[in-house]
Amino acid sequence: MAGATVTVEEVRKAQRATGPATVLAIGTATPANCVHQADYPDYYFRITKSEHMTELKEKFKRMCDKSQIRKRYMHLTEEYLAENPNMCAYMAPSLDARQDIVVVEVPKLGKAAAQKAIKEWGQPKSKITHLVFCTTSGVDMPGADYQLTKMLGLRPSVNRLMMYQQGCFAGGTVLRVAKDLAENNRGARVLVVCSEITAVTFRGPSESHLDSMVGQALFGDGAAAVIVGADPDERVERPLFQLVSASQTILPDSEGAIDGHLREVGLTFHLLKDVPGLISKNIERSLEEAFKPLGITDYNSIFWVAHPGGPAILDQVEAKVGLEKERMRATRHVLSEYGNMSSACVLFILDEMRKRSAEDGRATTGEGFEWGVLFGFGPGLTVETVVLHSVPITTGAAITA
């Protein structure tokens, strides 16, 4: 038998990219139906036929007032809920009705975001080699990744990964996975899509489960897409952020802090009060592990993209780390304008940050800073930490130290 003309090492080297994975485009989408937070308690208690629960409604109103959310977008309309009263009860069998919505609408909303990202990227869809699709909303086979491949007209040979039931940390997870795919497959262009619809979690109020009502006050619908690739061709591709490192960890003593369970009644949501405390208590360790190798100890000298699980989490992280209010501006803006869209949030924040940085004449896509951090927080308690490197917006502009 003739000897091989190349070695495994040579093959491996040829397969791998030279530079770091880079975000090349971002697109976002929401349903048309906009819900204003100030009006939501009246609407929510009316549509769920719970107006007799006056004290509970007052509690819910206070939750909405404290949420720092101005508006959210929701696929579920009053008409649809009126036709499906089981979805408005706290615990009534309704999974079929919920699945009927999300199986169709999750890929459809993902398509809207993906089309915007592909348009900004400016390259043919045939150059997309990988698809990573993430949703906490429903499960199906073949999955939303398959449906989106068909809807967009991607190549049948695109390498797909479907991530179901991850939760709010998964905006970091998809970037971590996309980084590995892009850097280990020379020439790869990874389409990442997070699409979330609250039809699986919407339910009526319960006096014995206030944690469920917290979710009803916070969650909104949205989809975000990014194109990730290494070694960008800067004649036709415009880098936005480099993905420098990515890691995941389970916080100590946090089991049961955030849970979701798929049942006949839909996806139930369970939350312990000390979630903000657990996250803030451990945030410095995550920052040290990520930034010590870079010689960075001043966390006001980096840009911040933090999953806005709720205002209490952001407040306690700011206090623990000693952050200036401006560091969380983009994060709080997305929370205010869209609510908590689970995995899609951090990608919305990246989009807001790069756009606002350009509008404000900042030197880089990261509010003028060179380095940044992206955090995902969710069930586990699981934390995703992604170190980002911005790119200059104007050639020769100084980067804020």
UniProtKB/Swiss-Prot annotation:
It catalyses: (E)-4-coumaroyl-CoA + 3 malonyl-CoA + 3 H(+) = 2',4,4',6'-tetrahydroxychalcone + 3 CO2 + 4 CoA. CDD domains: CHS_like. Pathway: Secondary metabolite biosynthesis; flavonoid biosynthesis. It comes from the Eukaryota. Keywords: Acyltransferase, Flavonoid biosynthesis, Transferase. One of its GO terms (biological process) is flavonoid biosynthetic process. Pfam families: Chal_sti_synt_C, Chal_sti_synt_N. Its EC number is 2.3.1.74. Belongs to the thiolase-like superfamily. Chalcone/stilbene synthases family. The primary product of this enzyme is 4,2',4',6'-tetrahydroxychalcone (also termed naringenin-chalcone or chalcone) which can under specific conditions spontaneously isomerize into naringenin. This is Chalcone synthase 2. The gene is CHS2.
